[in-house]
Structure formats: C-alpha cells, structure tokens
Regions:
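C-terminal structural segments of small proteins and small subunits
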Residues: 62-99
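Hydrophobic alpha-helical segments that drive targeting, anchoring, or assembly
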Residues: 24-25, 43, 47, 69
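Compact, glycine-rich, soluble single-domain proteins
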Residues: 36-52
Length: 100
C-alpha cells in the first residue's frame, strides 16, 4: 500500500438507487440551491467532472470529492449525514458488545 494511505475500512453510505458514497473521499456535502454552488455545477458539467447519480430525480445535494469530482445525489445533505451517524453509532455499539 502506498505511503500515507489509510488502512481503515472504507465507509460506504447508501445514497439511493443502488449508489453508495465512499465517505473517506468526501470533502463536503452541500445543497445545490445557492448561486455559487449552481455555478460550480454548471462549470463542472462543461469540464466533465460531474457524476449524476440521481436516476433522473431532482438534485437535493452536491457532493464534492477529493478527486475533484462533483456528485449529484437525490437525497438531502441531512439524510446523508443521518445515515453516516446512524451507521457509526451502530458500529460503535457492536464494537462495544465485542469488548464486554
């Protein structure tokens, strides 16, 4: 493995329609309503860095990744955060059960 890489398991979060996000590669999850974010999405489409995983639904969040891509998802940033927190709490509880 390359120097400086994280050996921990990648946390995948379901974002609908059979799609998942690798949370260790996510920089920010934002709502697409503001003018600056809409501008970034428009420019991203021109550059070819947009990954649309909405399956034709309305975009409710834009996910910025370490690789410079912008992923468009059909669930809200709050829903993504809730899924991360729910899964993390479940994993912590399971790990606590194993140490007892």
């Amino acid at each position: 493995m390359a120097r400086g890489q994280n050996h921990a398991a990648t946390e995948l979060v379901h974002v609908g329609f059979g799609n998942f996000l690798a949370m260790n590669k996510v920089l920010a999850i934002v709502t697409p309503g503001s003018a600056p974010i809409q501008r970034m999405i428009r420019e991203g489409k021109k550059k070819g860095i947009i990954i649309d995983i909405t399956s034709g639904r309305r975009t409710k969040a834009a996910v910025f990744t370490e690789t410079g891509n912008i992923m468009l998802v059909a669930i809200t940033p709050e829903a993504v955060a809730g899924r991360v927190n729910t899964r993390s709490a479940r994993l912590a509880r399971t790990a606590g059960d194993k140490t007892s």
